[in-house]
Amino acid sequence: GLWKSLLKNVGKAAGKAALNAVTDMVNQA
């Protein structure tokens, strides 16, 4: 349903943001 796809999109965006944050930390280390 709508909520399931919304949660999936939010989870995907959060995962991408977390991955970017980790990559930035590694690059600065």
From Swiss-Prot:
The keyword Secreted is annotated on this UniProt entry: yes
Protein location: Secreted
InterPro entries: Dermaseptin_dom
The keyword Cytoplasm is annotated on this UniProt entry: no
Any one of the GO CC terms: extracellular region
Distribution of this protein across tissues and organs: Expressed by the skin glands.
GO biological process terms on file: defense response to bacterium
Superkingdom of source: Eukaryota
Function per UniProt: Has antimicrobial activity.
Protein name, per record: Dermaseptin-J8
